[in-house]
Amino acid sequence: MGLADRTVRKMNSAFDGEDYGSEDGLIFCETEADARERLSRSAGKVLLVSDETACSAFAAIASHPRALSVVFDGDCLPLFSMPDGVSYVLASGGSEVLHAARYFAEVRGIGCTVYPALATLEGAYELKGTLQLGGERTQVPLAECSVVCDVQRLKGAFARGYARLLLTRLANFETRALSAFGIGQGAEPLPSFPETGEEDILRENANARLRERFAPVGEGATLAKLLDACGKPVPEWQAYLQLTSLYAAFFEKGKPRRYFTPDYRARAERAGTDYNLAGVPTAEEYVFRAMALERVRARFAREALSFVKEREAHCEKLSAWEQVSLHGGDLTFLKRLPEYEPHGLSAVIRDFGLMEWEL
């Protein structure tokens, strides 16, 4: 099934007969030109939402008499103080800004176009998001939107976009491995790695984000977000390095520590998570997984080791956009990943007593 077949497209009266770009659902255009055109075609006021890093995207149209500009500060609630008559919303920035604009569009029943600042296209395709609304974070529905990619503005983001595709492939491996342990439904292996042209990377990320509406995202995405929150450069690449090393070591030579029980409560306290969500396996589940490991070890070890062998070539490609290395960096979040993703492959490794190394 092609990307266009999975794209849910919402037409809005503000732009009757709106052009949704190429058949894969993405529009490739300069931000200024596209935003100016949408503003000129709007029947009412247009809300421009951006974060501090992307506010220049709308500089050319911000002074238009029908434009209302907002710099998003992390709380979505102030958006709803906008006056009546807003008929469309344009958003530029990271995933949270795009989520905020799409939630506003969903509540107001208006159209929305987003200009992602990340080549991962996170924020553009999710069906739901978690946003700060006043004093608490709440899961909210998100409107469908048009997605416009300005390749020139994204020039500094393609390393992360490429690395996110690596995590998508790793998530597919993780899903199949978990299925072998009796967890989840499994998945078909993904086809060969895509071309590395910049538009190819954007199209593949759009495809992946759409698949993730109904398929596991993988614990690599969670690890990347944890690393990103700490300001780590190209966090998707660091997450990929760490997890490929972990998976390869586990399937190649990991042996369950038969009489060792992880201190689940202490691990949850260190991670700041809820102990009740740890997902502790029953004795029967543990035995089944230990037996399954020996049955599938060789097959998954070969695939995991192939990921490790390919890292040098990927590192070279990534360095064309941003200098990266083969050093995985700080492993603190990797060690605590089972507490953040209790249904991931690292949790199975933890349950075997193999996530207790010293930092």
Predicted regions and their residues:
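A glycine/threonine-rich phosphate-anchoring loop and its flanking beta-alpha core
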Residues: Y103, V107-E195
